Amino acid sequence: MTCPLYICSENTKTVHVGRTVSVRNRKGAHNMSKINTGYSLNECPPIKETIIYSIQQIIVAVFNVIPVPLLIGAGIGLSSSEITILVAGCLLVTGIATILQTIGMGPVGARLPIVLECSFVFVAPGIALGSKYGLNVYTGACLVGSVITLILWTLFHKALTKMFKPYITGSVVMVLGISLCSTGISYCAGGSGATDFGDPVNLLLAAGTIVIMLLLNRYGKGFLSKASALISIVIMSAISALFGKLDLSSIANEKWFRIPEPLHFGIKFDLGPIVTISILCFIALVELMGDQASAAMLSEQRLPSAKESKGGIMAQGISSIISSMFNMVPTISGSANIGLCGITGVTSRYVVSFAGVVIAICSICPKLCAVFSVIPYPILGGVALTAFGTILVSGMNVIRNSELTSRETTIVGVSLAVGIGFSMVPDSLAAFPFWASSLLSGVPGTALTAIILSLLLKEDKMDDDTQKGDEEE
């Protein structure tokens, strides 16, 4: 969190960004003053602290990934034992992918504090295609789609990333934060489909979590500030037990060990599903680019380098291929985990990589996984909502620091309106096929609109003169 620092000067104004204060003078120049409130990107905390801080990341990640195999399995009518196989594969892939992204291997991996997890984007098509063609065909589509996307993004990385100017990336991150806020509110109310959804007690638990976390973050020193999310979760979980909201029975019911099985349901290829999944894989990588920008901004107040961007894309592509081999969906970056880094100030990639190790272990030890998954949704919602708000603000800061021309302002405004507008009224795209509606709303809609407009609205001398005039004032 940003420390309260105000610089009063006629010629400067203070811009608060993550853990750094950016001082912008009247000519638009930025001076960055780093405020050390946690562990930075390449710092490795002592092992005891690493374990504690990683637990915060594990809790958020497990809550995000567990519903993916559960929803797909239930949607296509799998037995409980078959769903268990999907869950094990999902956790194993999330752990491996996170380690690959944070620690890296050669050119692979962004080496930023990013959790890669099985994506909700693929749940709806997974149910639809799995029910119609079988899970083996869906697995084949995920495998081929991941390979195609990885090859295209690797070969044409420079050309593709050149289209994503900072103001476009900022717009994508901002819409990502806005779209995720609805998920956070849903968790606060009890979780989608919960029998007690909207219960005032749920909202009070969420509010209590937010208040405790922010107070510790604002006034706590050292450990209390950095572990604010974990401490608030523990306190509010104990309080939730008084209201009968904490159910520990699933821990006793789970087995101690299970082994993930690759290609348990077989694999088969069909052109139609392959095309659909390939498009969605491309969309997932657009979202990754936004999350990479957010992670770099929160950890080091900069945009990701070309090497980090390409390495992150390669890590997501390879992990999606591995995920397909375990009959699971392609991976995507965990935005909530990135936001959590911004809240606690612990942006160390080693903390996140340790979380990946534990999540991978959870894939063979269901009882350990159950310990993390019994936390009531409203409490997780309080943490998630705060994290998503951090993502939203980081996107706003990228846009603000871009010193927009009138042309770029138009592009940002229209692209935000399209992405946010369609996501607020999804029924307006009901007549379109799934892949088309996915391209037009939310993050993909914002990115696609911004890219098209940036190609149509060419830069001219008037834009340059306008920007120079603003700088001289």
What is the predicted function of each stretch?
Residues 48-65, 198-210, 227-228, 243, ...:
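Hydrophobic, membrane-embedded alpha-helices of multi-pass small-molecule transporters
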Residues 47, 73-111, 278-349, 468-472:
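Membrane-embedded helical hairpins/re-entrant loop segments and their flanking transmembrane helices
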Residues 32-44, 215-216, 229-277, 430-438, ...:
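Hydrophobic transmembrane alpha-helices of multi-pass solute/ion transporters
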Residues 129-249, 356, 360-465:
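Membrane-embedded alpha-helical modules
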Residues 107-120, 162-169, 224-230, 328-337, ...:
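Short, non-helical or kinked segments that cap or interrupt transmembrane helices
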